[in-house]
């Protein structure tokens, strides 16, 4: 596992959940002796939707909705076998999407 890097990309709609998940990942990696870079906050993606309230007339009557997607990036440099095992056993919140890549 030497000279490798694990890149973990987290995505969630709630910033509290994603911050809690990144804190758990960083703490687990540091406890097992790996070097951690991050968490790096990536730009938040904002999607806005405008919906007409009235089905027929009154075009001025509209509702606007927004979905914010928060992103974080964590790099684990020189992970050990204990680090990989601990990360595999880690149980994160259901609202957090995790993508892991080895490089």
UniProtKB/Swiss-Prot annotation:
Pfam families listed in its UniProt record: Ribosomal_S10 (PF00338)
**Single Gene Ontology BP annotation:** regulation of DNA-templated transcription elongation
Q: Which InterPro entries match?
A: Ribosomal_uS10, Ribosomal_uS10_CS, Ribosomal_uS10_dom, Ribosomal_uS10_dom_sf
Q: Per UniProt, what is one GO molecular function of this protein?
A: structural constituent of ribosome
Protein's UniProt keywords contain Ribosomal protein: yes
- Please give an example of a GO cellular component term from this record: transcription elongation factor complex
What keywords tag this UniProt record?
A: Ribonucleoprotein, Ribosomal protein, Ribosome biogenesis, RNA-binding, Transcription, Transcription antitermination, Transcription regulation
Kindly give the PROSITE patterns that the UniProt entry links to this protein.
RIBOSOMAL_S10 (PS00361)
Keyword Transcription listed? The answer is: yes
The protein's role, per its UniProt record: Involved in the binding of tRNA to the ribosomes. Part of the processive rRNA transcription and antitermination complex (rrnTAC). The complex forms an RNA-chaperone ring around the RNA exit tunnel of RNA polymerase (RNAP). It supports rapid transcription and antitermination of rRNA operons, cotranscriptional rRNA folding, and annealing of distal rRNA regions to allow correct ribosome biogenesis. In complex with NusB is involved in the regulation of ribosomal RNA (rRNA) biosynthesis by transcriptional antitermination.
Q: Which NCBIfam families match?
A: PRK00596.1 (NF001861), rpsJ_bact (TIGR01049)
Q: What protein family does this chain belong to?
A: Belongs to the universal ribosomal protein uS10 family.
- Subunit record text: Part of the 30S ribosomal subunit. Can also form a heterodimer with the transcription antitermination protein NusB. Binding of S10 to NusB is mutually exclusive with its incorporation into the ribosome. The rRNA transcription and antitermination complex (rrnTAC) consists of RNAP, NusA, NusB, NusE (this protein), NusG, SubB, ribosomal protein S4, DNA and precursor rRNA; S4 is more flexible than other subunits.
Name the UniProt record assigns to this protein: Small ribosomal subunit protein uS10
The beginning of the lineage is: Bacteria, Pseudomonadati, Pseudomonadota, Gammaproteobacteria, Enterobacterales
